[in-house]
Amino acid sequence: MSVILEHLPTGQKVGIAFSGGLDTSAALHWMKQKGALPYAYTANLGQPDETDYEAIPRKALEYGAEIARLIDCREPLVREGIAALQSGAFHITTAGVTYFNTTPIGRAVTGTMLVTAMKEDDVNIWGDGSTFKGNDIERFYRYGLLVNPDLKVYKPWLDSAFIDELGGRAEMSEFLQKSGFDYKMSAEKAYSTDSNILGATHEAKDLELLSSSIRIVQPIMGVAFWRDDVAVKAEEVTVRFEEGFPVALNGTTYADPVELMLEANRIGGRHGLGMSDQIENRIIEAKSRGIYEAPGMALLFAAYERLITGIHNEDTIEQYHENGRKLGRLLYQGRWFDSQAIMLRESAQRWVARPITGEVTLELRRGNDYSILNTDSPNLTFKPERLTMEKGESTFSPRDRIGQLTMRNLDITDTREKLLTYAKSGLITLSHGSELPKLNSGEKN
């Protein structure tokens, strides 16, 4: 049985994720006029472009909400962001530059916390502003039903009656003005922005054209590092981790992870660290493009992965990367709390993150240009004396290496025989002189 309501349920409580923007303001007032009982829930996600969170619920009451609540999601959001960092749960990269899944993390927290608040108010119908072509409609759907199995979903943007009356920004603005509200539609940007304390997403409109570059974006978490008139001075920063958790920046320890993330954002933002331009596959498999900011996450991740490479062995690091990519996809798809995601995350937090204690000093320059100046940890397995070319005590001798190389003869012989087998079947041509083996078409002559 479908839990999607295609038409407004009049006379019933309808929870709406209320941002205070034009879309949700018009939707809330429209639902009130049509006979529903709107309950407004606003998530404080530490959005860097929001200046007055307390004013948002007051707006909702003015537009007709029965009640309006502000839910502080910042601490859980930072906690989940650090869990994603510990797990390397990031699968979208271009030439080594990472998207830190900041919007999917935000949706996991928003979806669960707002529906929990609605449940407390006996509200079992939820509406939000996600569109039918995007990822969020599925993310919110999954997280909402995980929290409340009796939840019904009503989205004004899937209701033909709402679309017919208020299908565009101009129509919504006119509707509010005719209803007696002094709502002035803000100048429309060349792209849309969604943000939280972990990062910002810029997408749609002009950014749907690949010929429109990062240059049209005005960062909200840092500087436009690509502009020659923007001064960016090199800066040294030290990040300290204890058992996988970031705890200090430049010698200052933070008991509150929210304050630590805010300071990491300020430091990274001064350089434009963590900005990326990505082409990605949405949940529905259509490709989209986004320009992302995540200065604090990028700073912490650079230090975290440096410690990982100095502490863990190659096989552990390989498994961490493989599992992280899988977990990143699950997170992106709205499956952060699914059993397979919990398994991958728990494994990384327990066996990879726990030994990560130490300090990393970096020099930040412009954008994602930085150098690592020092790495220190009591758990380092990096031991220069093991490989020193100078005379002195050594962990192994030349004779030990001769024995190790002799043992390699076994698999070298196996490889040679396998190449001969491939050559006989026509798959490769054996080398002559200095040539390497060459692949053939694979077809027998």
Curated annotation (Swiss-Prot):
Cellular-component GO terms for this entry: cytoplasm
Binding positions for L-aspartate per the UniProt entry: T131, N135, D136
UniProt superkingdom: Bacteria
Entry's localization field: Cytoplasm
Group of enzyme by EC: ligase
InterPro entries reported for this sequence: Arg_succ_synth_type2_subfam, Arginosuc_syn_C, Arginosuc_syn_N, Arginosuc_synth, Arginosuc_synth_CS, Arginosuc_synth_type_1_subfam, AS_cat/multimer_dom_body, AS_multimer_C_tail
Pathway, per record: Amino-acid biosynthesis; L-arginine biosynthesis; L-arginine from L-ornithine and carbamoyl phosphate: step 2/3
SUPFAM superfamilies reported for this sequence: Adenine nucleotide alpha hydrolases-like, Argininosuccinate synthetase, C-terminal domain
Keyword ATP-binding attached: yes
Molecular functions per Gene Ontology: argininosuccinate synthase activity; ATP binding; protein homodimerization activity
Keywords recorded for this protein, A-Z: Amino-acid biosynthesis, Arginine biosynthesis, ATP-binding, Cytoplasm, Ligase, Nucleotide-binding
Pfam family, one: Arginosuc_syn_C
Subunit structure: Homotetramer.
Protein name: Argininosuccinate synthase
Lineage, broadest ranks: Bacteria, Pseudomonadati, Acidobacteriota, Terriglobia, Terriglobales
